[in-house]
């Protein structure tokens, strides 16, 4: 990780790297695995495309010593980690999402996926790599998304909503409907997002349960139901588990679920397709029926009864690689470069790397409505004591972090949980709790990842000074 989290404190051994350098560490681990004879050559020959090329053209440049200069880990620590991983009975990597939130995030993903391939982890019970395995893959999403009803429309990346609302476009965005989101708080480049939301010619509707930061900019706020007030079908985020949920209370007041609002809008717009006459339960029934396409039979009776259902998996599912070659493609001629390699993240021209980490009390900006949070540690900034001493800063000082996009105020907390040169603030707090209504996303960028159009929330540098 990039700093000592609560999870790291529970570990037998923890390794902390500079933000955005996971790819350099992965290559050094592969270098050691190959040198120490800990690779599974039979698995590599049968199931991996490009190992020999990677070993010949890339790995020699990425020694533990070179990676130490990049990651901040010692060469000895890198070797220790490589040997432990290579000798494990069931080498397993659990990936979060933080490593991908840099401009080199996609490349880092390619490099991390090379590790279980190198040691043949996929063939071992309990071995492999897990990022996200949403149970929603069991459903046909076309049932709800209905691509056949859509005309060709412009798609706007949510990570670039600030630019989309403020730049001259043809046609310009004149209306904004916000649901299940709070972009005034959670979107990057908060200053630009706010500038867009303040436009006099932008008509904004927010469908919400609480008066969020975004709702404060709305022309109309529509009350939304909670999960207790509407039926739905749920898919686990990290398990192959799905479950039908029924409403347990009637909608409060005029609250309506997303689907009901969509149907009412369709009716008001004169859209008469039968799709918009279906109920939530109709759609849920169709989604459950679509699980017929899952590789093995799904217990529909249990689903209908509202029980959690684990999706059955084929015996060899871990070796069924969904690529053109049917192998793990370390070498992919369609990619540039064809072989994975490390390159630094973008960052900014400022001295400190800034990480906006999760806080266990909230999820993104959800649960900010809890009154006790306004009395807790909000907008606290973790800094290594040695860095603070050099700048003449003390624990508890009011400080300001700045870069070309904006500024945000914090209370300084000195801690050896963070690395030298790194600052960490936990939690995406409603701007109501932030000085000057400036949250930490004043500092984050609309830059996108190298593939996939993902966010780069952690690829940020700032300067810091005592607040006057």
Q: Which residues make up each language-model segment?
A:
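Phosphate/diphosphate-binding loops
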Residues: 193, 199-203, 207-210, 244-267, ...
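Conserved short loop/turn motifs at secondary-structure junctions
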Residues: 69-73, 96-103, 181-183
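Long, well-ordered, tryptophan-enriched scaffold segments
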Residues: 3-88
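Flexible, glycine/charged-enriched surface loops at secondary-structure junctions
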Residues: 39-44, 92, 124-130, 273-280
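Short beta-alpha connecting loops at secondary-structure transitions
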Residues: 9-17, 225-228, 240-252
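Glycine-rich phosphate/diphosphate-binding loops that line cofactor/substrate pockets in enzymes
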Residues: 57, 79-92, 162-174
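Extended redox/cofactor-interaction regions of prokaryotic respiratory oxidoreductases
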Residues: 23-27, 111-217, 225-233, 302-391
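Long, contiguous, secondary-structure-rich segments that constitute the structural scaffold
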Residues: 252, 258-302, 371-382, 386-468
């Amino acid at each position: 990780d990039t700093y000592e989290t609560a999870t790291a404190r529970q570990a037998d051994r923890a390794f902390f790297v500079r933000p955005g350098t996971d790819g350099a560490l992965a290559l050094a681990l592969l270098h050691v695995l190959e040198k120490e004879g800990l690779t599974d050559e039979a698995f590599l020959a049968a199931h991996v495309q490009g190992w020999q090329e990677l070993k010949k053209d890339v790995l020699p440049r990425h020694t533990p010593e070179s990676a130490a200069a990049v990651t901040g880990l010692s060469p000895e620590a890198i070797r220790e980690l490589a040997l432990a991983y290579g000798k494990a009975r069931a080498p397993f990597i659990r990936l979060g999402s933080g490593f991908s939130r840099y401009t080199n995030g996609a490349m880092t993903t390619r490099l991390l996926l090379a590790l279980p391939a190198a040691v043949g982890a996929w063939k071992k019970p309990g071995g492999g790599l897990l990022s996200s395995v949403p149970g929603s893959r069991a459903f046909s999403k076309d049932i709800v998304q209905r691509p056949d009803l859509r005309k060709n429309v412009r798609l706007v990346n949510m990570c670039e909503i600030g630019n989309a609302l403020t730049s001259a476009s043809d046609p310009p965005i004149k209306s904004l409907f916000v649901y299940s989101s709070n972009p005034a708080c959670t979107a990057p480049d908060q200053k630009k997002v706010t500038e867009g939301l303040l436009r006099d010619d932008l008509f904004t509707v927010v469908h919400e349960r609480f008066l969020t930061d975004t709702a404060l900019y709305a022309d109309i706020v529509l009350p939304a139901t909670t999960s207790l007030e509407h039926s739905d079908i749920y898919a686990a985020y990290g398990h192959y588990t799905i479950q039908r949920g029924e409403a347990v209370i009637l909608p409060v007041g005029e609250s309506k679920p997303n689907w009901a609002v969509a149907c009412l809008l369709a009716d008001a717009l004169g859209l008469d397709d039968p799709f918009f006459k279906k109920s939530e339960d109709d759609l849920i029934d169709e989604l459950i029926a679509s699980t017929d396409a899952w590789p093995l039979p799904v217990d529909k009776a249990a689903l209908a009864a509202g029980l959690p259902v684990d999706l059955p998996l084929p015996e060899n599912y871990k070796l069924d690689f969904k690529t053109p070659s049917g192998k793990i493609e370390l070498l992919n001629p369609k990619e540039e470069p064809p072989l994975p390699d490390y390159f630094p993240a973008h960052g900014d021209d400022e001295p400190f790397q800034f990480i906006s980490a999760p806080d266990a009390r909230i999820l993104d900006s959800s649960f900010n409505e809890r009154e006790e949070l306004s009395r807790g540690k909000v907008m606290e900034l973790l800094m290594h004591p040695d860095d603070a001493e050099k700048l003449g800063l003390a624990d508890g000082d009011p400080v300001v972090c700045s870069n070309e996009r904006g500024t945000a105020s914090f209370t300084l907390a000195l801690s050896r949980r963070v690395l030298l040169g790194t600052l960490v603030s936990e939690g995406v707090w409603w701007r109501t709790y932030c000085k000057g209504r400036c949250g930490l996303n004043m500092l984050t960028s609309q830059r996108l990842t190298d593939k996939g159009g993902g966010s780069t929330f952690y690829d940020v540098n700032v300067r810091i000074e005592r607040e006057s």
